[in-house]
Amino acid sequence: MTLFGQEHVERYRATDGEEGHEWRGTQTLLLTTTGRRSGEPRTTPLIYAPAGEDQYTVIASKGGSDAPPAWYLNLAEDPEVEVQIKDDRFRARARTAGPDEKPAMWETMAAEWPDYDEYQLKTSREIPVVVLERLRS
């Protein structure tokens, strides 16, 4: 699968990740945030890595743009999100990784997608690492 965007989201959902979970040698999840202006759900496919029990790491890179991705800005308004990994859908709380944990998480993510290091060189902003922590009922 070479897509990444709305069609990626639609195929991922329709097949419970059979199409879309594996993407260019990586694994992706679907992150649904609440739009900070619209209040509407916004879903984005993102490369991820497990970060411990019930935790997953994603990178707010936007390809090295000087502006952060909209989904990251949405988290500032409402850190409670929905995550889908294959057929597993769950609520999670998102937080930006702290300075003590970020280097190891960044290294793990850059091993998954080496372009992250290049993205950081392209921008003056510090690209955040985001931790998604599954919420238990």
Regions found by a protein language model. Give the residues of each.
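Extreme N-terminal tail/first-helix region
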Residues: 1-27
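Short strand-connecting beta-turns/loops that link adjacent beta-strands
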Residues: 51-53, 88, 137
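Short beta-strand segments
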Residues: 26-61
